[in-house]
Amino acid sequence: MGLKKFLEDIEHHFEPGGKHEKWFALYEAAATLFYTPGLVTKRSSHVRDSVDLKRIMIMVWLAVFPAMFWGMYNAGGQAIAALNHLYSGDQLAAIVAGNWHYWLTEMLGGTMSSDAGWGSKMLLGATYFLPIYATVFIVGGFWEVLFCMVRKHEVNEGFFVTSILFALIVPPTLPLWQAALGITFGVVVAKEVFGGTGRNFLNPALAGRAFLFFAYPAQISGDLVWTAADGYSGATALSQWAQGGAGALINNATGQTITWMDAFIGNIPGSIGEVSTLALMIGAAFIVYMGIASWRIIGGVMIGMILLSTLFNVIGSDTNAMFNMPWHWHLVLGGFAFGMFFMATDPVSASFTNSGKWAYGILIGVMCVLIRVVNPAYPEGMMLAILFANLFAPLFDHVVVERNIKRRLARYGKQ
């Protein structure tokens, strides 16, 4: 018996009146994961397309894989470098024995020595990322299924993307209970309360991270959370620039200066999925080509960022080093690239009119630079900039639609 035949034979048990009716949401999610549903619209207009919401979400999920794999490799590499910088000999062995991430890596064939290869770095990074992702997926999935069962509709595939995006924008050292709490806030408060997928006006992943930032700032920001090494403290490159300009960009674990190419490739501490602009560009090119992400929004974000950062460069400052950060550094530091490619382009919380997308993107770019440069307490600004722009997205669309209506009335109203 083939899989499709098996799913068809048991379908009636999950339909209204069947003995497993309450589990229809789970059955539908599993069935449509493997096969495109044969549903058609009952009224005109009819559009036939095998790419449904689930396929779109899977494409976005696959698009973040380059950043995810590089992030695991980089997280492991940064941790190993920091450990060997702080400890050696018996002291290093004792540290490894006391941390399950370290000894599990060695048990699986890796090494924590300074000559560790890419496999060891990937293994160590995976021991940090995969538990976070699994926690986020299970806890968030529980809330998603619960709301679907209460509302008696199919599981919304939007969480498939929300879960991995959230896991990629947090530090590798985030406690698992906080990861569960953050995704709970994002799914329940920022999405399901407003009706679920397609009705939320805030990006759920960013809303969850913002909740953690304000509720538990010690585990989501500062100098202790970005490198997964016991006893190690090291600021992100963005924080270092804020403190002393380009000359302050030093990788404390290796003692080497951080170049622009290091930041572009992703050889710097940071959130798991945000460090490599190159990997993010690869994924972004795919979803833009597939028509999932709007190039207008991405272009607007770049325009807003370049214009305001250049203006600050011209103004200059002797007391605030962030005034002197060029636009190409803004692009590769912090969460700018990840936010621009995968958060700002969220089709639900972003503007949907073409002109609105430009305004929405420009606002994000401007607000990100403004927060980074002017706010001395918070060097990163992309998260707050996108959430702020989410609030204005409906206004942009309303203005565009009203202007189009007035223009057409003026053109054809008297005929």
From Swiss-Prot:
This is Na(+)-translocating NADH-quinone reductase subunit B. Pfam families: NQR2_RnfD_RnfE (PF03116). GO terms for molecular function: FMN binding; oxidoreductase activity, acting on NAD(P)H, quinone or similar compound as acceptor; riboflavin binding. NQR complex catalyzes the reduction of ubiquinone-1 to ubiquinol by two successive reactions, coupled with the transport of Na(+) ions from the cytoplasm to the periplasm. NqrA to NqrE are probably involved in the second step, the conversion of ubisemiquinone to ubiquinol. It is a multi-pass membrane protein. Its cofactor is riboflavin; FMN. Its EC number is 7.2.1.1.
